[in-house]
Amino acid sequence: MADEALAGLDEGALRKLLEVTADLAERRRIRSAIRELQRQELEREEEALASKRFRAERQDNKENWLHSQQREAEQQAALARLAGRLESMNDVEELTTLLRSAGEYEERKLIRAAIRRVRAQEIKAATLAGRLCSRLPSSGPREDSRRQAAHTLDPGKVPEPEQQEQQTEVLEPTPTPEDTSQDVTTVTLLLRAPPGGRPSSPASPHNSPTSASPEPLLEPAGAQCPAVEAPVSSEPLPHPSEAPSPEPPMSPVPSSSRGRVISKPLPGPTEPSDTLDSIRGFSNTKRADPSETKSCQRSLSVLSPRQPTPNREPTSLAGPSQFRRVGSVRDRVQKFTSDSPVVARLQDGPPRTALASPTPTRLPGPSLISTTPASSSSSNSSSPSPSDTSSHKKQRELAHSLAELQSCPQEEGPGGRGLALRSLENRAGGPKPCSEEPSTPPPVAVGTGEPGGSMKTTFTIEIKDGRGQASTGRVLLPTGNQRAELTLGLRAPPTLLSTSSGGKNTITHISNPGTVTRLGSVTHVTTFSHASPGNRGGCNFKMEPDPAEPPSTTVEAANGAEQARVDKGPEGRSPLSAEELTAIEDEGVLDKMLDQTTNFEERKLIRAALRELRQRKRDQRDKERERRLREARARPGESRSNVATETTTRHSQRAADGSTVGTVTKTERLVHSNDGTQTARTTTVESSFMRRLENGSSSSSTTTTTVQTKSFSSSSSSSSSKKMGSIFDREDQTSSRPGSLAALERRQAEKKKELMKAQSLPKTSASQARKAMIEKLEKEGSAGGPGTPRTAVQRSTSFGVPNANSIKQMLLDWCRAKTRGYEHVDIQNFSSSWSDGMAFCALVHNFFPEAFDYGQLSPQNRRQNFEMAFSSAEMLVDCVPLVEVEDMMIMGKKPDPKCVFTYVQSLYNHLRRHELRLRGKNV
């Protein structure tokens, strides 16, 4: 109970209670209650600050609500565009510069989230690189086998240092379960020998470099299609670190040595290799989560050029082509893709080239791939087609772009990236045009093999999502089956390149550059058919698009917190237009449309139409009013031809002794307009009393005259009537009329005379005489003449009852008259005119000038003014303050009119009574 009692007190009361309390436990409870009150006050202030932050835009500013909504939509669109830009930016320095230049809080929040994302990717990539390096000693058997393969393929080569031999190989460890979360895509291009050639030995499981890729699933192709001959040279390739050193060119490897190496038997085509089994096993057990493949959907601009290059004349390949010892990726790709020097001499060899089997290859990811085998080309030609030349040129452009990636300097740090690759990655986020027309073949690496080169080559492109991976090209030379593998650490969406035995190349793009592919979307295959050297025909390019879906835009914030999709499908109904809304003349129809419409733009149009309609109606009413006024002014004769009726009644009464004579004169003027719409009635009653006093030889007479005027006007066009009367003696009643000063003086003189007469005569006799004269006048008016004077007399008797508005106005007039001439006083109402207390002080000072010095008062000191006026009125005229000083201070600039009117009315009664007492004493 004590705690509840303390909870009901405010902080001041608690502190006073703390001062007078001696018990320690009680003082502790009081302090706890004070702290709780302070905490609640802080919470309320924080809530008030939080609610005021956007109040001007969203809540209080009702007039600019549409503008604030539009501004908010623009801000959301700008944030969405910034999120798209940040998704394609992967440089921490560039993001930091953008963060320093950003001024908005929401933009800075998005940029910080993007910086955290990039740093997390770099840390993840560095961790993976550390795991790979920790497994370095386990690759000893591979090193020995690959060194043997290098010496076998190039017997005349000088042995290189041990360090370079370790750099030449690529460590492909078995992936751990935690490694499978990274987006890694390996695209394998497999070249197999034709049926007539001698097969090579199968690859051992630990010699297969593709076993480290858990995602692609390659089916054995030997049972489904005839194998083809490899188009590449079997010479070993040096490491990229040897690129800057100029060394003499090396002669091509003789075909005899090549045949000597490849003379190992190969199992039947229906037997799958151990490598394919290992790949299948990893892909079946360790599938990547489809939700984690979004980051792998960025495009590689090197593999999808913007515009097709013009065809070039075929280059003569008759001369001996010598490979230099250069470590660039361009030379390595040319070794795999360019024609061998023996091609020109052996045109009659078996059919050349293939890059992979036509069997469908499944790639996990957000897209579903369907591969359609193309029909064999039936056209034969002895000369190369322009498509061949264009394809070779695209191969050279691809190699040149990859060489630029390798030749660029690396960034600092363990996970350095090439500068060119970084620019490509930063540009990959934006939309790029991807040509899918039949006239623009994709850049597929197509080459022709050598006769007798019965080796098979695997061209592998690993596309990893790790940021810290070094983008270096490496050549793997396994021992068992002489498979050459080129791995490029490039970031790109998954791309499948395959070629069947009949010379058909197939390229499949899983996602277009710069777009976000939704889960479950299907991308059909783009088939590019290329004939073999023995069967050189035209170029077929076929694209099978998806059925059209309603376009949708996916916006993903940089921090990955929220994702909004805006469907841009065609609307079911046509949008409203401003012309249709302008044609509607009914406000009710527009109001119903506004209630039923949910689209923001349409609601804005409907509101604009409502405003225009209301403005038109207002203009129409104003024009009609002006027209009626002009018509009234155009008929001045009619306005003067009003019918006026005036009735005058005079009644005199004389006492029996002749000492008192009373006269009552009543004049009634009734004016009717010509059309009968307006009526004005004026009644004037003049009472005159004369008394003669005779004292011996001298006689004197006193005359008192009272004039009372009542006016009443009515109009049949409106139901309201205007009544004019007075129950107060107002000093400024005739101040606005012409000659107001003379009339005011005359009236004041009459009032003084009447007051003196009333005080000198017995009150009973005067009141009785007045009542008797009025009764006689009414009787005479009702007895003679038509009924109009009778009605006028009845109206005049009931006219003296005022309404509330007239009472307030007359009280304001009395206060204004009493405070005329006082500084800082302007009485116009019962609210703001009395807010500073100067009007109260002026009203009291007018009756009691000696009570206080009005000149010392100031409107700024409101409390002193209220205390001075209220205390003086209570002390001098016994007027109890019906309103407190604290209430007036709390109400501020606009106090309650009812409170002020009640107190002013009480003040009027007391001051008026005091004034009458003063007049009685003076008389």
Curated annotation (Swiss-Prot):
Residues 164-179, 192-205, 366-389, 697-721 have a biased composition (Low complexity). The modification Phosphothreonine is found at residues 359, 372. One of its GO terms (cellular component) is cytoskeleton. It comes from the Eukaryota. Keywords: Acetylation, Coiled coil, Cytoplasm, Cytoskeleton, Phosphoprotein. The modification Phosphoserine is found at residues 299, 301, 304, 340, 501, 521, 574, 641, 735, 798. Belongs to the smoothelin family. This is Smoothelin. It comes from Mus musculus.
